Structures are given as structure tokens and as C-alpha cells.
Swiss-Prot record:
<keyword id="KW-0805">Transcription regulation</keyword>
<keyword id="KW-0804">Transcription</keyword>
<feature type="compositionally biased region" description="Polar residues">
    <location>
        <begin position="167"/>
        <end position="183"/>
    </location>
</feature>
<feature type="compositionally biased region" description="Basic and acidic residues">
    <location>
        <begin position="613"/>
        <end position="626"/>
    </location>
</feature>
<keyword id="KW-0238">DNA-binding</keyword>
<keyword id="KW-0371">Homeobox</keyword>
<feature type="compositionally biased region" description="Low complexity">
    <location>
        <begin position="52"/>
        <end position="79"/>
    </location>
</feature>
<feature type="region of interest" description="Disordered">
    <location>
        <begin position="485"/>
        <end position="508"/>
    </location>
</feature>
<feature type="region of interest" description="Disordered">
    <location>
        <begin position="129"/>
        <end position="244"/>
    </location>
</feature>
<dbReference type="GO" id="GO:0005634">
    <property type="term" value="C:nucleus"/>
</dbReference>
<keyword id="KW-0539">Nucleus</keyword>
<comment type="function">
    <text>Probable DNA-binding regulatory protein involved in cell-fate specification.</text>
</comment>
<dbReference type="Pfam" id="PF02376">
    <property type="entry name" value="CUT"/>
</dbReference>
<feature type="compositionally biased region" description="Acidic residues">
    <location>
        <begin position="571"/>
        <end position="604"/>
    </location>
</feature>
<feature type="compositionally biased region" description="Polar residues">
    <location>
        <begin position="190"/>
        <end position="204"/>
    </location>
</feature>
<feature type="compositionally biased region" description="Basic and acidic residues">
    <location>
        <begin position="131"/>
        <end position="140"/>
    </location>
</feature>
<dbReference type="InterPro" id="IPR001356">
    <property type="entry name" value="HD"/>
</dbReference>
Length: 641
């Protein structure tokens, strides 16, 4: 350095003033960059360093003239790269600095940002240039970057011992040419979509650029970025026209002691492109997210459930009596069939309704015994336990016992009726009823073969004028009925019959409504009425006999005999009326059932008693013959003769 300055004093005054403002680039990576010029281990640049940059022939001793020629004679350059070599005026404010900046850099070195590295990573230590960002009073500050005089880097020279100026840039840095073009433009035209690198973000003037972005997008600033702008007031400086000036805060002068957080760059970037965040407390909770009460699970595999008590094969249960008892319990305690089917049987309401109407025999059930077993175990429990299993309280049952609510099936029917009334008549498929000929023909064929072929079913359908599906359904239903055997079931000798507790005796009104009980109960009531009438008539005849014996009324030579005669006549008349009524009813039924051809066939088969037509004709003729017994007919006949 001293020899180069001594050689420079031999030139003219113009060159002296220019030399004072211009120093030559010499990089010593092992230096601590403290104002100490007495270091003897400073390493100079190679002799061919400028040859690799500029095509001009430059000698190490004539480095000053090369800088002058590069400045004054750009037209003589044969390479277009010289157009990018702009002079870099250096400030004379630092005469004691050992290392200053120079303008003899290519476009790639010219675009390196003047940025002090505050992070502790090795990216900043490996960069070839560190540009000072402190304020300069030179009028060429905006156009001439200068090399920074580093302060207090401590032992960083140990990491940079063998590095030469031709060391490639770190992978984290972006293209220097694109960064240069970005910084030369107006800061207001910067695009937000570009992702800045750590080096391009904190350049020669990083803070005003971030400040402009914050001002430009202050409507979309997130709370985190607002905190960043408040906490770092040292970076916010006013603008003086196009020239941006700022000073270091006192706490920033020591670059080693004052470090920036690693996430500062991400915060600055997110402040530009971030959108307002939505607080989770403001988001309404969906209805499905609310915690519902745990629903009770009804399972047929739970061993703790009393309804799953095992019933051995040596036990016989009369399913018909059991279904009658279940129907009585449902009616008496106003228990909907849907609830009972779901919570007791774990089945649907339609399955329960079908079982109550047509209970299957116990000995012909295999897997279906489980349903009747749960029914039996439920009936065997006390009333409070039965209602507790159904999740129903006794008070609710007593309050609802006045009028039972309609079951879901009834509600469905009511809804269908209401919709049909509003929407018009609903096309419902009428139920098919076989005629007698069709029924007897199908039954006769079924006795011969229970599984006719498809062709035979088609022939039967064409002959009887039926659909093929109807014929197929008939044979399928007939096979099912034959397997059931008419639901005739009796316990085997080794089975023990489990008695079903019958309903209370006093509840006859409810028993009359339980389907199959209606007909036998009606017959019983009618039989009692006839019995009372017979007793009344017998008592009345005894009183008459007593009165006659005491002398009341006309005496009859044989009162008992006359009474027997009278009673006998009356009984005979009653028998005749009964026979006549029976014959008339039979005749009417025959007329309703079929045509004359069918009647002839039935008479030939002997299925029906002889028709009373002849007797009626004979009676009518007899009546006609007995009509002129008054003598008028004979008198008129004699007069005519």
C-alpha cells in the first residue's frame, strides 16, 4: 500500500486528487479490518486479477493508469463488458483505512449489495465483499458503492483463511444480475411476488424498501408484522427526494453484539403478502361438534343384559301365548311398537308386527329363537324393570295410560292418507284374488309337483290368464306353507313347557281388541246370552204350570201332556226354521261363490248338500194347492161348469 501511494505522487495534480478519492481493491480475508496498517501479513490480489476482468493489458505497477484508462477511455475498449464498468468515487473520509472500495469491478461484483451480515450463519462470512452502509458525505454516494471497513469481526478470519476472490458465491444468494436490476428500479415498482434472498433483502438500503412495502400494504398488515415495525424504529428514516439516508442506531454499531433474529426476513415478507387471519374464537361451532349424550346401545351379545339369559333346548315356549301377552303389555302400557322392537328385540317395527300376527312355532325355529327368548325374558321381569329397560318411567306410563299414542306405523298411514288427499288419488296395485278354477288348478298341480319348470309355469300362466310372476309366487308361498305344516307345534316328550303368565282377568275390554281373541270371546258372550234366554223360558213355563195347578186359567185335562205337546210343536217349528235358514244361506253362498257350471261340478263332487230348490218348489205348489181350501175356488169352478 505504501509503495503504491509513493508511486502515485509522481503524477500531476489532477491524478493526485483523483488518487485521493480512489483506492484500489485489495482483499485480505485474514484481516480483522480494524484501523491498523501495520499488519505485515496482508495478502494482495494476484497480478492477473484485472486481466480476468478487463481485456486491457494491465501491469501490477501501472494499476493507477489502468484505472485512469478505464475511466477516461471507454471508447477504445473492444469488449462490450466495459460499458458496465462505472467509476466508483471513494470518500476521503477514511484516510487511515487499509482497505477501501474500488470501481474496477464487473457487473457481477457491482451488483453485490452493501449489507452487513447480522446473522450468525456462514453465508455472510463467505461473501467476497462487505459493503459499509454508514452515511457518506460524498456527492457520488448513490452511484458509487464502496467497500466496507469491517469492525469487530473477532475470529472470523480463521474461517476465511484460504479463500480467494474467485470464490463462488453461496448457493443461498440469488442471481446478482436480477438483484441489480431490481435495485436500480424505483422501489415503488417492486413486485411482491418475487421471493427475496437474505442478501437481497438486507442490501445497501434495506430498511426504506421494507418501510415502503409496509406503507404500501398497510391495509393487509398482520399483527405480527405490526409488532416488527414498532420494535425496529432504528430502520425507519425520512426520505429526502430520491436520496435515501439513514444512520445506524447506537445499539446497531457493533455488528457482532447486535444480531437480528433469523425469522425477521420471513416476517418482513409475510407483512407484504399476508392476509388478515381469522381468530378461532370467532369461528362458529357447527352443530355436529356439540357433544351429544351417549346413546344407549342395545345388543344381543351383552352377557350382563338380563334379556340375553339363555334358554336350553329342553325348554319349550308357546310362541302364540307369548305374542298374546306381548300385545297385551304394549296396549295396556301404551308402549309404541317401534320402541319395543328397537330396544328389546333389536329389530324393526315391521318385524315385530309380523311376529305378533303370525308367531312361528318354537320347535321349528333355529336362529329365530333369539327374538322370542328376549320377549320371554322381558315378560318375566317385574313391571318397574320392564319399563326401566325401555327407558320409560312409571309416572309417564300412568299419565299416558288414559289414551295410547299412535304407533309409528299408524303415523305413517295417517301421513299417507293426508298426502293422498292433497296430491290426488295414489295408484295402488289392487290385491289379486284367484278365482275358484284358478285356485283349484294351481293346488292340483302343486300336489303333483312342488317345483314346476319355467316352461310349465309359463304354460299354466297362459292357460289361466295370469302373469308368470303370479304363478311363480303361488308355488313359492305354497312350498313355504307346506314346510310350516299349518303352524302346528307341540312340545316333545323331553321338553319342559314354560308357562306364560296370562294377562289379568279383569281386563276383558283390552282382550277383546287383541285380534284372534275377538272371535272366541264373542262366541262365549253369545252362548251366555242364549243360556240366559233358555233359563228364562224354562222358568216361565214352570210358573205357568204352578198357576195352572192352582186353578188359574182354563184347566186342561193333561197339563203336563198339553205342555209337552205345545213345547214339542214349538221345537219342531224352530228346527224347521233353522233348517230352512241354513239351506237358504248355503244357497246364497253357492250363488256368490261361482257360476252355474261350478255349482254343477260341486254337486257332482258331493261337496255341497242337495240343493233345496225342489223342496221350495214343492212347498210353493203345496201352498197353491192349499189356497182354495176356503171353498171359494170350488164354488167358482162349479159355476164355470
Amino acid at each position: 500500500m505504501e509503495s503504491s501511494r509513493t508511486a502515485a505522487t509522481s503524477t500531476n495534480g489532477t491524478e493526485k486528487s483523483r488518487r485521493r478519492n480512489t483506492d484500489y481493491l485489495q482483499i485480505d480475508p485474514s484481516s480483522t479490518f480494524i484501523n491498523n496498517t501495520g499488519r505485515g501479513f496482508a495478502e494482495e490480489l494476484p497480478e492477473n486479477f484485472l486481466d480476468t476482468i478487463s481485456p486491457h493489458p494491465i501491469t501490477p505497477s501501472a494499476s493507477t493508469s489502468s484505472a485512469t484508462s478505464a475511466t477516461e477511455e471507454p471508447a477504445t475498449s473492444s469488449a462490450p463488458q466495459l460499458a458496465s464498468l462505472a467509476p466508483m468515487s471513494m470518500s476521503s473520509e477514511q484516510p487511515s483505512s487499509s482497505f477501501s472500495s474500488a470501481s474496477l469491478l464487473s457487473s457481477s461484483y457491482e451488483t453485490i449489495k452493501n449489507e452487513p451480515e447480522f446473522s450468525g450463519s456462514t453465508a455472510g462470512l463467505l461473501s467476497p465483499l462487505h459493503v459499509d452502509s454508514r452515511r457518506r458525505e460524498s456527492h457520488d454516494f448513490n452511484t458509487s458503492p464502496y467497500i466496507k471497513e469491517e469492525e469487530d469481526l473477532d475470529g472470523s478470519h480463521l474461517l476465511m483463511g484460504g479463500i480467494r476472490p474467485d470464490t463462488p458465491t453461496n448457493d443461498r444468494s440469488t442471481d446478482l444480475g436480477s438483484i441489480s436490476s431490481l435495485l436500480n428500479e424505483d422501489h415503488h415498482t417492486n413486485t411482491i411476488g418475487q421471493s427475496p434472498s437474505p442478501r437481497s433483502t438486507f442490501g445497501s438500503d434495506p430498511t426504506p424498501m421494507i418501510q415502503r412495502q409496509l406503507i404500501k400494504n398497510e391495509d393487509g398488515v398482520s399483527p405480527g408484522s405490526m409488532g416488527f415495525s414498532k420494535n425496529h424504529q432504528g430502520y425507519q428514516k425520512p426520505r429526502n427526494g430520491d436520496r435515501m439516508e439513514y444512520e445506524k442506531a447506537p445499539y446497531q454499531r457493533n455488528s457482532r453484539k447486535q444480531k437480528k433474529p433469523l425469522g425477521l426476513l420471513n416476517q418482513a415478507l409475510s407483512s407484504v403478502i399476508s392476509t388478515p387471519t381469522i381468530s378461532s374464537s370467532n369461528i362458529p361451532t357447527p352443530p355436529s361438534a356439540h357433544i351429544a349424550q351417549p346413546r344407549r346401545i342395545y345388543s344381543t351379545q351383552d352377557s350382563n343384559d338380563p334379556l340375553n339369559a339363555e334358554i336350553g333346548d329342553d325348554i319349550y315356549i308357546d310362541t302364540k301365548d307369548l305374542c298374546k301377552r306381548i300385545a297385551f303389555e304394549l296396549k295396556n302400557h301404551s308402549i309404541p311398537q317401534a320402541i319395543f322392537a328397537e330396544r328389546i328385540l333389536c329389530r324393526s317395527q315391521g318385524t315385530l308386527s309380523d311376529l305378533l300376527r303370525n308367531p312361528k312355532p318354537w320347535n321349528k325355529l333355529k336362529s329365530g329363537r333369539e327374538t322370542f327368548r328376549r320377549m320371554y325374558n322381558w315378560v318375566a321381569q317385574p313391571l318397574a324393570t320392564r319399563l326401566a329397560i325401555l327407558d320409560m318411567k312409571t309416572e309417564d306410563v300412568n299419565r299416558a295410560s288414559g289414551m295410547s299414542p299412535p304407533t309409528p306405523a299408524q303415523n305413517v298411514r295417517t301421513h299417507r292418507r293426508s298426502t293422498s288427499d292433497h296430491d290426488g288419488p295414489v295408484s295402488k296395485r289392487p290385491r289379486l284374488v284367484f278365482t275358484d278354477i284358478q285356485k283349484r288348478t294351481l293346488q292340483a298341480i302343486f300336489k303333483e309337483t312342488q317345483r314346476p319348470s319355467r316352461e310349465m309355469q309359463q304354460t299354466i300362466a297362459e292357460h289361466l290368464r295370469l302373469d308368470l310372476s303370479t304363478v311363480a309366487n303361488f308355488f313359492m308361498n305354497a312350498r313355504r306353507r307346506s314346510r310350516l305344516g299349518g303352524n302346528i307345534d307341540e312340545p316333545t316328550p323331553f321338553q319342559q313347557v314354560k308357562n306364560i303368565s296370562p294377562p289379568p282377568v279383569g281386563d276383558t275390554s283390552d282382550a277383546l281388541l287383541n285380534g284372534d281373541d275377538h272371535v272366541p270371546l264373542l262366541n262365549t258372550v253369545m252362548a251366555e246370552m242364549y243360556k240366559e234366554g233358555a233359563i228364562a223360558t224354562s222358568n216361565h213355563s214352570a210358573e205357568q204350570r204352578e198357576m195352572i195347578e192352582r186353578g188359574f186359567g182354563v184347566s186342561i185335562p193333561g197339563p203336563s201332556h198339553s205342555g209337552e205337546l205345545l213345547n214339542g210343536d214349538s221345537h219342531e217349528d224352530d228346527e224347521e226354521l233353522d233348517e230352512l235358514n241354513d239351506s237358504e244361506l248355503a244357497y246364497e253362498e253357492d250363488v256368490e261363490i261361482g257360476d252355474e257350471e261350478e255349482e254343477d261340478e260341486e254337486q257332482a263332487n258331493g261337496d255341497i248338500l242337495p240343493t233345496p230348490k225342489v223342496e221350495e218348489l214343492e212347498e210353493k205348489t203345496v201352498i197353491k194347492e192349499e189356497a182354495p181350501d176356503d171353498g171359494e175356488y170350488g164354488a167358482t169352478k162349479l159355476a164355470a161348469n
